[in-house]
């Protein structure tokens, strides 16, 4: 689900670095880019299209608000899902696949299962992002800051860390209910920086759950709490 917008952001930064393009580079958004019946604060703000927006703002929409139209606009700009998939695999993270756009998945709900990752692969990718110089620092700093300001999923990984002296950057993913009434996905991945300089990455995925959405988020929050207490010896 929308966790893959983190993967997309890394591939985008690599592409822009090679093209020597600034985050202020602007794209023209047409009305047909703003699909109806999908989650899109971008469309809600500019329903008629016909405007320019820079890459930085589009990343804010995808990483902070999980905007589906902004995601597909960026896919089109950077060369499609295959480009993202190949880039992530080139980093040695191969237990994942990104083959469908947001619009693909909204046209056919079953396609969402074709975009997948193991939790370990997602956590490894977070560690690679934190520790390695994948692309120019300005892109890394921007993605890092944007993830720490994520507005979605405050009841998941973040919940047990509120009030703690930590910095957390994360990206959520939320699926609809399938024909069986199960929530297809309730996900959250993130990195946590501790005040003593240590850090860890965490990925928690709840798949095809018959629990309500609030309970699925609580499961993620409980695991986040347990990991934090283990790492900090509490």
What are these regions (language model features)?
Residues 6-11, 121-124, 222:
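Short amphipathic alpha-helical face segments that pack within enzyme cores
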Residues 34-73, 81:
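Conserved catalytic neighborhood of penicillin-recognizing serine enzymes
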Residues 1-27, 62, 202:
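Active-site SXXK
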Residues 30-32, 63-66, 77-78, 100-101, ...:
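Active-site-proximal beta-strand/loop segments in catalytic clefts of secreted hydrolases
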Residues 1-3, 22-24, 93, 163, ...:
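Extracytoplasmic
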Residues 14-34, 81, 136-140:
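Short, well-structured active-site flanking segments
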């Amino acid at each position: 689900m929308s966790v893959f917008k983190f993967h997309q952001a890394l591939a985008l930064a690599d592409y822009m670095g090679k093209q020597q393009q600034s985050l202020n580079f602007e794209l023209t958004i047409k009305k047909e880019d703003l699909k109806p019946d999908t989650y899109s604060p971008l469309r809600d703000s500019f329903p008629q299209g016909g405007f320019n927006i820079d890459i930085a703002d589009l990343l804010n929409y995808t990483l902070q608000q999980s905007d589906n139209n902004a995601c597909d606009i960026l896919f089109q700009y950077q060369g499609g899902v295959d480009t993202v998939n190949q880039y992530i695999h080139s980093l040695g993270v191969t237990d994942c696949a990104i083959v469908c756009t947001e619009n693909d998945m909204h046209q056919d709900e079953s396609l969402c299962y074709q975009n997948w990752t193991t939790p370990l692969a997602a956590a490894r990718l977070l560690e690679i992002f934190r520790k390695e110089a994948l692309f120019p620092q300005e892109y890394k700093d921007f993605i890092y800051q944007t993830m720490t300001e994520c507005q979605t999923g405050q009841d998941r990984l973040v919940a047990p860390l509120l009030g703690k002296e930590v910095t957390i950057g994360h990206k959520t993913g939320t699926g609809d209910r399938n024909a069986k009434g199960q929530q297809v996905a309730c996900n959250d991945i993130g990195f946590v920086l501790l005040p003593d300089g240590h850090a860890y990455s965490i990925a928690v995925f709840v798949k095809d759950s018959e629990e309500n959405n609030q309970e699925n988020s609580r499961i993620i929050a409980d695991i986040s709490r347990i990991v934090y207490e283990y790492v900090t010896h509490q």
